[in-house]
Amino acid sequence: MQSFPASLFSDGPALRLLGLAIKAQESKGELSLDDEIRRYIRTVRGNWIANWNCSVYTASGVLEFTADSVERGEGLAPFPPEFREKAERAAGDVNPAEYLRMLAEIVRILDREPSPEYGELPMAGWEFQLTFPYLFGFDAILMDEGDQEFADTVRSAVTNEHPYCAEGAAAYTTEAQRALVLFPGPDALKSRLYWATRDRLQELIATVNEHMQREHP
């Protein structure tokens, strides 16, 4: 069999896309494969680092390369266990190489479309966690510090990282600002995070900015 780097199939875009395909198949009609891939494309396009590291076009190429490796070799047997299991589940009764090529073609076709707005295609839970990881993580901090005022909790979270707080502080405010733009209105992200209303997100931004102006003039 043609050699291939196992790490390419231990993680990365092929494994992610197979996971989304399985999720759609096992949702009993609640999820559409096309829509899950549209969300994947929207997520990659919306993150400069992700897009620079592995564009959607490249991800479709990885699927094609995988299909070639399966077809020219010993099937899925030489692949890492997690990849093999997901490929078998996703393909079902279809030849795995054929399924991977079909998935690659779907990705390529949908990549030609503009990304749908969130009002048109709501943000999925997995997409939310990738788009707002710091706000999602802040939820746990609020649970631990539930007796404090909201601004005090924000202040403590930033101060505890000082003087190495720049990365976290920037991430909190960036994600909060992005949430306010993407989800205008008083509820903002409340449907995903009970506390993340417009007022609370604005308070978070103001509190972090206050710390930065005071400690990092």
Language model features with spans:
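An almost-null, non-specific background feature
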Residues: 18, 24-27, 72, 92, ...
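Charge-rich, solvent-exposed alpha-helical interaction surfaces
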Residues: 20, 36-43, 61-69, 79-86, ...
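Amphipathic alpha-helical binding modules
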Residues: 74-130, 188-217
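Function-determining sites in protein domains
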Residues: 1-4, 82, 159-202
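Amphipathic alpha-helical interface segments
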Residues: 11-31, 46-50, 67-79, 87-98
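Amphipathic alpha-helical interaction modules
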Residues: 27-76, 137-177
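Short terminal alpha-helical segments
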Residues: 1-45, 100-156
